[in-house]
């Protein structure tokens, strides 16, 4: 199965806060299967963001085997993004974002994130994944759109 989705850490963090694994087991089981079956990946840089948390979300992602390590092709796209938007990446805040977009571009996958675009006059420092992804030809969907695409009902 080819990778269809690249998951932003904010999706998993929001799930953990609003749909805890011990209560929403069917949601988490389906999401785990999506990752385990190779239909979705989490870039290592997004995993690093998860590791800053106090829960076991990073360990859960590692267990699925869905952590994606950037290769030279991904690094080249990250460099293009950084050149185009030099003020966008702030290490403590969004260091994973260009890797999420670059991974999706290289794999021909869709980014899943909870971020929304800002207006076109937004300064680089305030850009969001959907704006940058659009410029690089990468499709972005929200979590509920992912569920609809997969036909998931809860």
Tell where the protein language model's regions lie, with residue ranges:
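Active-site neighborhoods of divalent-metal-dependent phosphate/nucleic-acid chemistry enzymes
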Residues: 72-131
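A short acidic, often aromatic-flanked loop/helix-cap motif at beta-alpha or helix-coil junctions
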Residues: 48-49, 73-79, 137, 146-151
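Conserved beta-strand termini and adjacent loop/short-helix elements that scaffold enzyme active sites
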Residues: 43-45, 70-71, 143
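Short, contiguous, well-structured surface segments enriched in hydrophobic/aromatic residues
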Residues: 62, 66-68
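Short, well-structured N-terminal submotif of metal-dependent ribonuclease cores
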Residues: 1-42, 49-62
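Acidic, PIN/NYN-like endoribonuclease modules and their adjacent C-terminal/linker elements
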Residues: 2-4, 16, 117-154
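Residue-level detector of structured alpha->beta connecting loops
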Residues: 39, 65, 105-108, 137
């Amino acid at each position: 199965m080819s990778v269809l989705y690249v998951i932003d850490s904010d999706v998993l963090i929001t799930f953990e806060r609003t749909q805890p694994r011990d209560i929403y087991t069917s949601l988490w089981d389906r999401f785990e299967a999506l990752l385990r079956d190779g239909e979705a990946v989490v870039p290592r840089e997004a995993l690093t963001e998860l590791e800053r948390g106090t829960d076991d979300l990073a360990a859960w992602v590692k267990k699925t085997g869905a952590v994606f390590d950037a290769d030279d092709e991904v690094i080249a796209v990250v460099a293009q993004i950084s050149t185009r938007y030099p003020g966008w990446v702030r290490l403590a805040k969004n260091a994973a974002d260009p890797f999420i977009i670059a991974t999706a571009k290289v794999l021909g996958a869709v980014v899943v994130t909870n971020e929304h675009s800002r207006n076109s006059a937004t300064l680089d420092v305030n850009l969001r994944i959907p704006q940058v992804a659009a410029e690089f030809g990468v499709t972005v969907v929200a979590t509920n759109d992912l569920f609809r695409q997969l036909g998931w009902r809860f």
